[in-house]
Each structure stands twice: as C-alpha cells, then as structure tokens.
Amino acid sequence: MKGLIDISPALRVGMGVFPGDADFAVSQTFTIGPDCPVNVASFAMSTHCGAHVDAPLHYDPLGASIDMLDLGDFIGPARVIDARGKDPLCGFEEIASALDGAPPRLLLKLMDRGDQLTWPTGFRALAPETVERLALRGVRLIGVDVPSVDPETSKSLPSHMVCRRHDVRIVENLVLADVIPGDYELIALPLKLRGLDAAPVRAVLRRLGSQ
C-alpha cells in the first residue's frame, strides 16, 4: 500500500532465534492434489521469534500478559532515530539531540543489520539509564532493531526492569536498516495470545501525510 514501510522480518525456517529458544518450524497438513483442493500449513515458533512485543509477564511473574495490553500504545506517532555506535550500550547523550519534540514512541536503529537470518551475536543494546531518561520524558514505547533491549548475556535485564517500573512497551527485532530517521505513524499490533508473555507483530510505518 502506498506510503507504508514494512519493518517486520519475514518469519522463515532457519532464521536466527535467541540461543536455546525454539526454532521457527513449518509442516504441511494438506497439499493440493487429486484428492485435496487446498494447501494448509501449520507452524510453530517462540513468542519472541521475529518482530515481537514483550508483555510485562515476560520479565515480571505478576505482569500483564500480551492480550491485556492497551492496543493504543502500538498505534500512533513515532520517531525513528539512528542510534548506531561502537559501545555495546547506547547512552542517552548519543540520541539526546534527536529527541526535541519527539512523540511518545521511539524506534532506535542500534546496528547495521542487513541479514535477518543470522543471529546478531554481540548486538548493541540500551543502557538502563537511557531507558530511564526516555521514560521520564514521556516515552511510552521503545522499539529496537535487535533481539532485546538488554545484552544477550544479561541475566538481570536492567533495561527491561526500567520498562517495568515505568510501564513502557517494548518492541524488538524490527527491520530499520533502510528507514530514514524521522517522524512516522507506527502500526504494530501484537497478536491476541491469551495469557502469554509476548506476541509477534506485523509492524509498519506510514509516512506522515500519506493515505
């Protein structure tokens, strides 16, 4: 559709997943042939495969599940910010100049990631102080183009914990490589999976002023 930018990776067999998590898998239930008029496939995947929203339940045993979240958080004005850098954690000062007049949804381009099939070992994440200061500025949703807002090896998940305290929504594994920094409308609705800790999204951006 005119004006839409797809920022979701294709879900496919062989794509990178968090170490130890379930692989994306597909099986064929029915195949078109002399005795069958249709193709029907089934698939299995982790709730954190591809572009997805983390529910508070993911990092808080008493947190809300994905079906309980307000959908309004995932639709509305958003700003894409180039937050690439050499340090393993993105500091607030690196993006501060891009925040003037920013809407409550921020999408951060943290690394050059062209191949979504390959797991991005050592990916750049967010310093918890960065998340804290963004939340205090009124940011309600943070999206990143890496698998997690915390480093791959983190066990304490400090940036997730800041999001928990401030009730900030998290969208991970977006495709932002070719998106020009600036302001857009974000549409990233998570699937309504009752009682689960996360859900995949088909996230898109709409250029402001487009129909």
Predicted features along the sequence, with ranges:
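Active-/binding-site microenvironments in catalytic and ligand-binding cores
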Residues: 1-211
